[in-house]
Amino acid sequence: MDCNSVPIDTSHLPYCFTRFPVRIHKDKEEIQRFTLELIHATKKEDSKAHKHSLYKYAFGPDMNIYSLSWCEADLDKMKLLIDFIELTWAHDDVAEEEPLENAVAESERLCRAMYEEYDSEPVADNGFGMRIKRFRDIRDRMKAIDAVGWVEVRDATEEWLHIDAKLKNFESLEEYLNIRKVHVGNKITTSFIRWTMGIRLSKAELSFIEPYTDCIGVWLGLMNDYMSWKRERTQPTDRVVNSVHLVMNKYNLPEEAAIDMIRGVLVRQEGKVLEMSEDLLGRTELSTNMRMYIQNLEYYAGGLFYWHFLAPRYTKPQSFDPERAD
């Protein structure tokens, strides 16, 4: 039952080609207010990071990524989710522009912040040190609310923080997508669906549903690559993690042909997800929690597509020039 969200009509957007349902949290104004308040409180005013963060939310409450992606979340838990995701996004944005060796080392240190036994480790008096302190604080607050659910979030985050070490020159799109489904953060974001809604699944249920969530992870990686290529193609980095770039090099394709190819793969992957959804929901033995989870995975996918499709972060990407933010 959908208690916290309302549907969004996308029929007036002819190029919005997803078939996933799109919904938005009924408390979208409060979620937007909290998001902006957090950005102002944690980032230096007029800094590059501050401007880039604000740009993500420039279209107001109707385009808040949290309201769209976790549309059925408990509001109090949603605020902790926002704190957690904004911090991991900040780390990811910085790590993308760091040499790979540095990024892997910083990810390892951030990972240790999820475990109390490392709290005695000193932290530097800089931006990274502040992220470590914030991560420890968020960890404690999440555990206080739901310690069991926190373990699932922690384990998914740990896998994601270590994924950069597996990046390489991939031999095939299939090999790339097997890593990309983790690299894109799908396991973290889907664990947050369960955590924010109090959905408890057994280990057997999580194992049973994993092929479906992996299928969504592949779709999410392709969708993010397709939507973000315009932004990422000029990003200063020693590694480009994007399937458009991969097929351009693998098949010696011009850029537009590579973009069209990835769009085709994306559409076919969405079809696979929807077929699996229909098959799973047709099974009479599924628990109520499992049905709720599958339905909200579709909402999550639809909300993320809608946000990527319209967000200024991707439709009008900002400059990566350190002296500019537009």
Residue ranges and their predicted role:
Residues 1-326:
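Alpha-helical, largely C-terminal catalytic domains
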